[in-house]
Amino acid sequence: NRVYLINSTRDIAKLGITAENNPLAHKDLTAFFTETGDGAELYLLVMAQATLLSQMCSIEDGSPLKKLITYAKGRIRLVGFNRLPPAEYSADTTETGIDKDVVTAATAAQSVGDSFAKKVMPFRCLVPAAGWGGKTDKLYKPREGSTNRVGFVMACDDQVNKTAAVGQMLGRAAKYPVNYSLARVKSGVIATEGWLTNGETPEECDAMLDLLDEAGYIIYRSFPKKNGYYPNDDPMGAPLSDDYSNLNYGRVVDKAMIIAYTTFVEEIQDDIETDDDGNIPQEMCSYYEGRINNAVASAMQGEISNFTSYVDPAQNVLSTRLMT
């Protein structure tokens, strides 16, 4: 229940995490830093093995997710959840094809993410498509969901335990600019061998890959005459019509939001002139807009194609004590 800040594979060893005493944490942490290299900032919170994903993502005060985000004071932009359940655990897959608790967790994580975004602490999540038995009938389709802050990882980098490649996908996302898709081929091979969370290779599940892709799962794909696997895409649990249907779309907006906030917050409690109705002069609004636009353009070169801020002059800042 303690949060640790890890910056390298050396820190994994310092914490005493090994493939023997904590195979899931060791696997995901190693995969993350294999992608990013040493120096990346990763916050780790390890829970008891019996802890459900839905409990990790709970909207209740003091939940692991809320604890993690609060501890990092808004520095976390990507969150990955994974779980190696105890031997006696039996996943309920009757209605969803994957562990129903994963779907419940995604809904909770979405609510928590929305609440923190209002505090200018936005983040996106990846959850494991755990418990999948290899069948597609009744399979939950993230693309028909309403969790545009949460993606479902069905790619697996552990054939024995069938755990999702969450750390690996987080590392790929963290390594590159926010506008890059996980599926960008120029980013290189993400795995030389891999499976899906039913323990079978993509080749063994070839007849289902298109369906899984269309359903909105993050899986492995390969290309003729190219070795290894690449992510198929970075879908979130939302339809393609959603503005944040993919991870990179949401990450771009999150970064712009934070830059706009950190620029605008410098103006708090500064002295400004207002008209008789308490409204801000248009020239001051234009000044604020210019500062924000310039900050975003400077910090997000190549990551965003267009950005325009707007400060409404028709707002009584004297009575509301707010400026938007």
Q: PLM ranges: what are they?
A:
Residues 36-40, 215-219, 263, 267, ...:
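Short secondary-structure junctions and interdomain/linker hinges
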Residues 282-305:
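Short, hydrophobic/π-rich interface segment
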Residues 314-324:
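C-terminal edge-of-domain segments
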Residues 1-133:
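Small-residue-rich
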Residues 170-284:
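Long, contiguous, structured domain-core segments that constitute the functional module of a protein
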Residues 305-312:
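A short glycine-rich, hydrophobically flanked beta-strand micro-motif that places a catalytic Asp/Glu
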Residues 76-208:
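Conserved, well-structured core segments that form the ligand-binding/active-site neighborhood
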